[in-house]
From Swiss-Prot:
Catalyzes the ATP-dependent amidation of deamido-NAD to form NAD. Uses ammonia as a nitrogen source. Gene3D superfamilies: HUPs. GO terms for molecular function: ATP binding; glutaminase activity; metal ion binding; NAD+ synthase (glutamine-hydrolyzing) activity; NAD+ synthase activity. The gene is nadE. It catalyses: deamido-NAD(+) + NH4(+) + ATP = AMP + diphosphate + NAD(+) + H(+). SUPFAM superfamilies: Adenine nucleotide alpha hydrolases-like. Keywords: ATP-binding, Ligase, Magnesium, Metal-binding, NAD, Nucleotide-binding. Mg(2+) binds at residues 45, 147. ATP binds at residues 39-46, 142, 171, 193. Its EC number is 6.3.1.5. It comes from Sulfolobus acidocaldarius (strain ATCC 33909 / DSM 639 / JCM 8929 / NBRC 15157 / NCIMB 11770). Homodimer. NCBIfam families: nadE, PRK13980.1. This is NH(3)-dependent NAD(+) synthetase. Belongs to the NAD synthetase family.
Length: 279
């Protein structure tokens, strides 16, 4: 990552923490909910989001939802975070999702890796919302800005949440925030992975490390630099810059509500624009 970009992405993390904790707390209160529920995988994003949630409210619950493709290391790391946030046994639930996923796969009659992986992500979303309804909690998402921009999430899976506290922080920034919050270095440095199948890593699928990805995203979409400029500044081939830019463009549908075909004078989303928490 160019030093120029690193400096731009380095924030006042005590202030960021204070702001995000307050926003989580206020959103829960304004929504009329009693607390928040979160899925913890043992990765950097869910670890940081869990710490922030625990600082925002005592009323939190953590779901660990491993499958046969979940590395043991991830579960070990998840328990490190449970200890860090002082989560007693009443504050977390472990559910192996393999039986749920198997039933969906049987119904669909597929062994396709991608389809099965998306079923896993959507099964976790269903469980999170079931527990959220049980406790009258909000579902707190764990996605970061890098993943959201790239579309590197499952639509109505890990993308199906009520709030995204980390949604305006690049992966590089989430790692910085994690260090500030005391997240163990093994988690901070671990290669990100949705673990939807064995051996899956985000950087392996995308073809670049996140520091490079974040540099491209920042320079293209926040500083509006040209692809040629970015290629020179980040020292990566132009085709890789274009690949990242294309990933952002083709995933726009994941970041928007479903398209409504306009027939009236005032249609929802395009004209019907009221506050998210409208009272």
């Amino acid at each position: 990552m160019p030093e120029y970009v690193r400096e731009k992405l380095t924030l006042n993390f005590p202030l960021v923490t204070e702001y995000l904790v307050k926003r989580i707390k206020d959103y829960i209160n304004n929504s009329g909910k009693s607390g928040g529920i979160i899925g913890l995988s043992g990765g950097i994003d869910s670890s940081v989001a869990s710490v922030l949630l625990s600082k925002a409210t005592e009323n939190f619950h953590v779901l660990l939802m491993p499958s046969s493709s979940t590395p043991k290391e991830d579960l070990d790391h998840a328990f490190m975070i449970l200890r860090l946030i002082n989560a007693t046994e009443s504050k977390y639930t472990i559910i192996n999702i393999d039986p749920i996923v198997d039933q969906f796969r049987l119904a669909v009659k597929t062994n396709d890796k991608i389809i099965s992986g998306n079923i896993k992500a959507r099964s976790r979303m269903i469980l999170l919302y079931a527990f959220a309804q049980k406790f009258n909690y909000l579902v707190v998402g764990t996605g970061d800005k890098s993943e959201l921009m790239l579309g590197y999430f499952t639509k109505y899976g890990d993308g199906g949440v009520d709030i995204l506290p980390l949604g305006d922080l690049y992966k590089t920034q989430v790692r910085m925030l994690g260090r500030y919050l005391g997240v163990p270095e093994d988690i901070v440095k671990k290669p990100p992975s949705p673990a939807l199948w064995e051996g899956q890593t985000a950087e392996g699928e995308i073809g670049l490390d996140y520091e490079t990805i974040d540099s491209i995203l920042y320079l293209r979409f926040e500083e509006m630099r040209s692809e040629n400029e970015i290629s020179a500044l980040v020292n990566v081939p132009i085709d890789l810059v274009r690949r990242i830019v294309r990933m952002v463009k083709i995933s726009q549908h994941k970041r928007l509500p479903p398209e409504i075909f306009r027939l009236s004078g005032r249609s929802i989303n395009s004209d019907w624009r009221y506050p998210r928490q409208w009272a």
